[in-house]
């Protein structure tokens, strides 16, 4: 636009030729406003889980999309690319990589304590290997994921329009178990982050039942039931102060150790066997760095390292030198390698759209509150459906009690509309009841079927 085409009018400039208007703003205020909008979008729509179902929008959309096309635990697998296309085209227009990566993580047994997706094919490894491309892998929902979607068709949760206003998607899932406590979550937002540990399902359910029985239950009583995090890679929690702090305040540092045992080889030499490693530790990277420490003489007493892990479980073998003392080598491994790592708990989740730091009791409270709302809505839906059915059955019973008159009226009518209007006028039926009578199959007129209708109505 040429400067000669612009007319200055107070706080804005008007383009005479194109009818455009350029508003003058303070750049500091504009940047502040734009940054707040961006940060809230990341916090609410991307990085933080909802306290009710423990899911971020992308995970929720993947599970809902799989449920909608019927990729259930008792059905055949479907190509991952098919699911990604479904979710991308209908609910999550932010690139196929984000959708596929989220789905892959939900299928990895070393990433989630209770995986929600069952994968077939190469979904990566604990060594940091990348999964195969989505065109090669296949997925379906696990049974536990289906428990998160039970009764979703019964108006149990609120829905919102998708990105192009063509479909509706759930704002939250009506999950039947506290997924946020059970599987944890992690995410980096703008100005805040969340890092929540997974826990044992049985303990969490027992803790939830204890809270339902006594809403004023003391934190110490809850902690006796939900004892500590339960990481998918196993391992040992070293020290309890960090765990207790995480339960009580929503923040804490949990120290994790790999499980090491001493064995004797067939040649009579001692060796250390690692059967589990801390959560979120890359096994191959840990072994490589340990080898570097041995070569640099920072760890003495180890002659060789072998990774004998297979589909039956993890097994990393450290062959010891003849003069090595196992306990000293174990302490060195914990001190210098990732066999001892920490997990910094920061329980930040969305409560009514706002980020909050939650302790153990808060997490259980918001889940129970959510389930109360879900069960209430389900009951209201089922009552409404039962009333609709009773209304139709009332009409059918009227027709069966006046069968000869109804048949005569229908036979005398020239069109379905005429028959429907005649039924409404003569028997005081509603349009819904009249339609049901006209749609009724002739077999309903038998004595047995008439008895069934009466019993169903009663």
Q: Language-model segments: what does each one mean?
A:
Residues 1-3:
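Short, small-residue-biased leader/transition segments that mark boundaries at the very start
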Residues 7-12, 18-20, 27, 186, ...:
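C-terminal interaction appendages of subunits in large macromolecular complexes
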Residues 8-250, 315-317:
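Catalytic phosphate-handling regions of large nucleic-acid enzymes and associated NTPases
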